[in-house]
């Protein structure tokens, strides 16, 4: 407990109370903070001016980060024939149809992303109660139900992050690991923000991106100037 307290105090000393940092300043500051005993993820939380209870204000999508997430992603694909071959060639870890569905029903869970060709949804649809709670149910809005299986697998392997505003209108996403250069983390952040901006609902009034915070897995959230989130 003493070590945790010492680290927490050291982190607190580096933060200026009430200060709002630029995105790059926040990322550089995170890298200067005392390290945890593992390579922490760098995460962003963005408060959006949306009401997710309204169907036309649901913000959900995916972004391919130029420098990846630093995480090895295992991809399962539901496809047949040419699409199954394309999935394997693109690096999918698991490819199948009914037999894969049976394995998942029996408890198989060694995958991080599930992708399906449209025709496979008749099979995948049976897995809603298993994949849904884990956030793994394929969905065309995030590119995981698609005819272009090759691109979907390549994107997932390259470090695509999926996001959705929660019931409070907050988007949480990982933009890399703390051992990334600050500039690479910033470029990943810009890619994420660009996708979130594309999904701005036409029905909302007022400010879309209201507040933003950047943090590591075990660190505090650092308030970030929303204007610094884009590379415009």
UniProtKB/Swiss-Prot annotation:
PANTHER family per record: 54S RIBOSOMAL PROTEIN L1, MITOCHONDRIAL, LARGE RIBOSOMAL SUBUNIT PROTEIN UL1M
Domain of life: Bacteria
Function text: Binds directly to 23S rRNA. The L1 stalk is quite mobile in the ribosome, and is involved in E site tRNA release. Protein L1 is also a translational repressor protein, it controls the translation of the L11 operon by binding to its mRNA.
The keyword Lipid biosynthesis is annotated on this UniProt entry: no
Family annotation (CDD domains): Ribosomal_L1
NCBIfam families per the UniProt record, alphabetical: rplA_bact (TIGR01169)
Alphabetical list of InterPro entries matching this protein: Ribosom_uL1_bac-type, Ribosomal_uL1, Ribosomal_uL1-like, Ribosomal_uL1/biogenesis, Ribosomal_uL1_3-a/b-sand, Ribosomal_uL1_CS
Parts of the chain that traverse the membrane: none
Cysteine-cysteine disulfides: none
Gene Ontology molecular function terms on file: rRNA binding; structural constituent of ribosome; tRNA binding
Name under which the protein is recorded: Large ribosomal subunit protein uL1
Keywords: Repressor, Ribonucleoprotein, Ribosomal protein, RNA-binding, rRNA-binding, Translation regulation, tRNA-binding
Quaternary structure and partners: Part of the 50S ribosomal subunit.
Gene3D superfamilies reported in the protein's UniProt record: 3.30.190.20, 3.40.50.790
UniProt organism field: Dichelobacter nodosus (strain VCS1703A)
